[in-house]
Amino acid sequence: MANIRKANISDAYSCAEIVHSWVQATSWMPNRFTLAELESLIEERMPNREIWVVGDPIFAYLSFDRPNNSIAALYSKNPGQGHGRQLINHIKSHSSFLQLWSHSFNSKAHKFYMREGFVTKEFNQLGADGIPEIRFEWKR
């Protein structure tokens, strides 16, 4: 597996590219932000979140809000290669409880989270993008 490291400000563009590509390829996801806007959003969150990346160049990243034990984002250029699991396991190794919200239409992500030990807790809460979401939890 590739090495995991904490992201720095110069990684924001690569992380934004991964999200932007996913949005472009996902028919149900509204395209609300340009690549430059996504980069700025990630940069703005860096001081308040732990952002972890895999690869050089970066091919997966996870944004973690430690005070809330919340995974705020998990994106991979090539899902199914084990990089999401690697990032989740990294966060699990330092936590006894995790939570996250996932778009209700993202059934592939739901299957992944359930394989990783997460269970569903809440359904159909509207996210900031107007799409219903499901909250998942994991406990050690």
Give residue ranges: language-model regions.
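Conserved GNAT-fold acetyl-CoA-binding loop/helix
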Residues: 17-42
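A short helix-loop-beta-strand connector motif used in the catalytic cores of GNAT acetyltransferases and
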Residues: 40-53, 70
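Conserved beta-strand in the GNAT
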Residues: 53-66, 70-75
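Conserved catalytic-core motifs of GNAT/GCN5-like acyltransferases
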Residues: 101-103, 119-135
